[in-house]
Amino acid sequence: MPMRRLCLILLCGLVAVPAALAGARVTGDGVLELSKGDGLVVVNGTRGTLWGQMDKGKLVVTDPILGDGQVFVSGADRTHIVSDSVTVYAGVDITFRVTGGKYKLRLQGSGIDFTAVGVGTAQLGGDVLADHPGVYALDSGTWNPVPAFPATRLVSFGVQPTATQ
């Protein structure tokens, strides 16, 4: 009986180690968080959800594939519809949420906070005149300072599945 138990434990170990190593490379959703951002942020989401708020500034929403997701914005003082897929919002205390589908958000202002869950990229550029242009974190990791413009940082969150043929 003890020999069977030992064999079973060793067999489980042989199966678990490769599975754990493969788990680090699987495709899936990532998380990008921005806190107290001042400057310019451009988020290109391939899929997923994003929600946040901006104390003051301008938000340009691009929905490249109409109907594949929904974009909700509230609190804007001014709204300008540029085309079927592009809308510009400006003002104070703007809140926004994107659910599903592809999206592009261009946020320029102060007090930008958001969380993006899914797959995408973000270009982060802090306001050079700001005392503290904000911090960001990937996958609940350590918080990193947003670089001040003209320096920017391109960050990716999540892993897009590769196309199979």
Can you name each region flagged by the protein language model?
Residues 19-24:
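Boundary at the C-terminal end of the N-terminal hydrophobic targeting segment
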Residues 8-9, 157:
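General helical structural elements
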Residues 1-6:
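Positively charged n-region of N-terminal signal peptides that target proteins for export
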Residues 26-31:
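N-terminal "mature head" segments of proteins
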Residues 123-165:
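Edge beta-strand at a domain terminus
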Residues 9-18:
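Bacterial N-terminal signal peptides
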Residues 32, 36-138:
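Predominantly extracellular/secreted and cell-surface proteins with exposed
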